[in-house]
A protein has these predicted regions:
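N- or domain-start disorder-to-order transition segments that initiate the globular core
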Residues: 1-20
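Generic structural signal for well-ordered, non-membrane alpha-helical segments
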Residues: 6, 10, 40, 64-75, ...
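Solvent-exposed alpha-helices and their adjacent loops that cap or buttress functional pockets
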Residues: 14-18, 22-24, 81, 142-148, ...
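Amphipathic alpha-helical packing elements
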Residues: 21-35, 156, 161
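A structural signal for small-residue-enriched, beta-sheet-centric alpha/beta enzyme cores
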Residues: 23, 86-98, 176-274
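Glycine-rich nucleotide/cofactor/substrate-binding loop typically near the N-terminus or early
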Residues: 28, 33-35, 39-65, 69-125, ...
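Short, hinge-like loop/turn segments at secondary-structure boundaries
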Residues: 42-43, 104-107, 172-173, 228-233
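Divalent-metal (Mg2+/Mn2+/Ca2+)-assisted nucleotide/phosphate chemistry catalytic cores
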Residues: 94-183
Length: 274
């Protein structure tokens, strides 16, 4: 089997990349391991009178479908409403799919044996012919394998990082290494709130990864708003400024790291971190 057989880009995503249209990668660890599989009504934070709901627009939530499936469908719909083609990444039958269609999404959503795949797991899962949801790190690798061009923007909820108690047990997510080595812009609501966020920021600094707050000077805390005492190194206030940064970082200066664009969770959807 050739490398091209191990990673396949859907025709929709490939056409968009060939035409130079906007493509946003989406991960599937949230589908396989992040949220419940049973059917549930639409969260109130996705109602049209909330900011997140307005982004999704007229997406009709199917309350009879698995919650994890509808969650990813809603995220993909938000990408389309914003003018981008969503490239949902996941593994089916040992093939890393870049641009899952709805039937493939549904298949992965209901598979209770699906694996959670980081970069270390991809090769073995491919050999095993496994199904799996991709983490931030694995999805960034998939972005680099997309054809005919790489995908430069990836949206997710929050990155992994340095866990609390790292002084006793050095539990550090592979997401940080991926950010240091894969030139992809990761748009996320900062780092997951369960982490040592200050240590995560220090690690990103040591790895040479730019962290920019999108419309904020404070570090976002995933679902919990922002950390009032933890500042981000840089701030941008519009998408064109992000594009200019990426062009300078990658194309003008040839720096081959990722960039973390820290976009806070909408205030009307944030929860108390305590």
């Amino acid at each position: 089997m050739t490398p091209g057989d191990r990673a396949r880009t859907s025709s929709e995503v490939a056409d968009a990349l060939a035409d130079g249209r906007a493509v946003v990668a989406l991960e599937t660890a949230v589908l396989t391991h992040g949220v419940p599989r049973d059917a549930r009504p639409r969260p109130t934070t996705l109602d049209p009178d909330h900011e997140a709901g307005r982004i999704l627009g007229d997406h009709e939530w199917d309350a009879s479908a698995p919650f994890n499936l509808e969650t990813v469908r809603a995220i993909a719909a938000g990408c389309r409403r914003s003018g981008a083609v969503p490239a949902v990444v996941g593994m089916l039958d040992g093939v890393l799919r870049i641009g899952l269609d709805d039937a493939e999404l549904e298949r992965l959503a209901v598979d209770s044996s699906a694996r959670k795949l980081s970069t270390r797991d991809l090769g073995l899962a491919a050999i095993d012919g496994a199904n799996g949801g991709t983490t931030v790190a694995a999805t960034m690798r998939a972005c680099r394998l997309a054809a005919p061009r790489t995908i430069e923007v990836f949206a997710t909820g929050g990155i992994g990082g340095v866990h609390r108690g790292w002084q006793q047990r050095p539990d550090v997510s592979a997401d940080l290494r991926a950010l240091a080595t894969e030139p992809v812009a990761v748009v996320a609501a900062g780092a997951k709130v369960i982490l040592d966020v200050a240590a995560t920021l220090e690690a990103l600094d040591s790895l040479g990864v730019p962290v920019v707050g999108f419309g904020t000077d404070a570090m976002p805390l995933f679902t919990a708003g922002v950390h009032s005492e933890l500042r981000v190194p840089h701030r941008v206030d519009d998408a064109s400024s992000v594009a200019s940064l990426l062009r300078s970082h990658w194309h003008d200066l040839g720096i081959a790291s990722g960039v973390l664009v820290a976009n806070p969770c909408p205030e009307d959807a944030a929860i108390d971190s305590t």
